[in-house]
């Protein structure tokens, strides 16, 4: 990564602002300027523009070198350089300009491919790709679109290549290419020991042959300049020969011996080729090698050595060879303006989303944000079918009405006004000129955006109004020098996330204003709008449709979380919280220090637990070792610990007298219905820790589902009537339709005949049960002998693995840990036997992590779940055990019961 010190990123603005220094503007004046200085100015502007296009948009600030009271145009060369960056002939599609006194501003909108344009555009902006190919007798530089299709084609070929991980896909075509190059008429010359000056070759230039001639003293420099582009072109096409010392009439002239020596020719060629950047989509071990051979052949004239002919034979490359790193820039406030390396550039260029990786994706999920029409940093956003779309979520959470300015959430607005006497008048005075839009209040917009809270802030209010850009108001009780920094940082993060996470493709900036309750004149405080840049009117939200578009991006910003699909598809995918989940997550932690969250199976309790720990960290400025997560079983503990957001332990470890709790201030408890008191009163211990600091007690949130209780012992939870305050999660978001139907049946059976250890009133939550319908799946119950069960599961796993599923998508769950230890080896042996028979690496397709007990797997999920003889040792919780098993399966559920040796007919529930 190379940074550019000549371009300064200003940090005190709520936008990306790049100061490009002094630049002469105006067509006539620029034409009179020294050409080298003019080129340097153009380079700075081009780099800054490209960096902003790729980073969410922003502003280039130019100090005008030539003073002029009349508005100046940039100059034709600058306009052309900007136009060359974008996929549109309309410069104003991405750039607007404005002159204010001696400053000239270029307002840059984020790069994106227009959804109205059916043609696929590259994901990022580049000045040059550094990729070349051969076209007839020419070397052709690929533009961004050509490079996109070239890389996409290479990636698709590698994916479909019938080779395994031990042999790169290049092996198959390389043999053919070798024969092709050797049958080329140039091969005979390549094999020669000596040639005659003036000899005419019996072949001419073609797609696989290029002639170059030079006899100057700068021969080595000339070679260094031409080799990278020609080697890239041959390697990216079908291979070929580069002759250095032959003119375009096929006559051998050579390089005079007085100007070069044979060893230096080879050294120059080898050094130039060794520096070429390459990118592999395949598993080639020769990660940085272009396959080539250099020959230096003596050229004689009338029997005397005259000079040398240099020939480079290049084989076709399996993936992509560049002449140098692609020419593209990005910017952020920490790094400044910097270049992308080759690997970063390629991965962004071919980042076309997960659609091609899964046939089930469009069948089971709705796309909320596609990469095809989004800014470069966006990740795809999907929601399970049947869940609310971002449009519905926006209407529910942030509805805009014509000719109406609403405050939301109303409950928070009322609460804040009752707590702070001058607040209502102060806010209304600021927004009185707006008649249509929303004022979205939060105790801390910083925390909502995963930044640290500032305790002196009473609240933040985001104004989304017609004929105005978004404005973030930060309201303080007393004057605070750091208030403006907080507001600016929060507004900048919001603007960046609206574009780079929410996928907003319009022009956007977030203005800032800090208000102080103790000040009589907020227009003269440090809270006045800090941005001296006067943005064009195109940054105003012109109508309700534009406001709704921005608010839908805001929904994605606030409700997104990393999806389980990310690991399955091999690329990061985001999901959205439900409105019900978001409402719980939005609670004020300072007001809700203890909370019981009752959630039905698959309603997202663990997701909320993880999100709330992130919120705790930002609200209370605490390190991860101050937050403790407690669950009953080790697999869930390990899953949470890997997230690096807290310290995760099991209940047993927590209750061990050797376990030190002094540093912990906040505790999150998950799957609490399966806790026990055999090692002591865990609830009182947790409460004692979180209440240890009387002036600032910690957070204690407990997540549970009585329906999934897997034992009859005392749980240690307080009486149901004392579990206050409490919230409920009733929308099942995990399971396919057939599995959800089975869950509902089992829930009802438990509701009708609950175990004595479960409070009857806790089961009334079932009345609110609902699931997001529309996802197909499998639910089967089968009776088999143990031997047939092993074959059945192995067959099914073979089918799923052949369809692209991985072992991480599969769980085989036994009733008890003892049964798992007794029978696991039988399944593994059969699976490995099958894999060896098919000559596949058995370690990569089956391992012991696929096997566990139903109880230990609590809180986790898999796409495919096999339940082995799920019979509870304690009859009253038999339906609870089935429920625990079934709720782990997202897509396919197979329940297999042991039949008698005599056999029993299979029963399949469809």
Curated annotation (Swiss-Prot):
Stretches of the chain forming a coiled coil according to its record: none
Tissue: In T-cells, expressed at relatively constant levels during development: expressed in immature CD3(-)CD4(-)CD8(-) T-cells (DN stage), in CD4(+)CD8(+) double-positive stage (DP) and mature CD4(+) or CD8(+) thymocytes. Expression is slightly reduced at the DP stage.
Binding site for ATP: 599-606
Cofactor note: Can also use Mn(2+).
Catalytic site positions: 205, 210
Conditions for induction: Induced following infection. Induced in response to LPS and interferon.
Function: Endoribonuclease that cleaves tRNAs and rRNAs.
Entry's family note: Belongs to the Schlafen family. Subgroup III subfamily.
Protein known as: Schlafen family member 9
Organism: Mus musculus
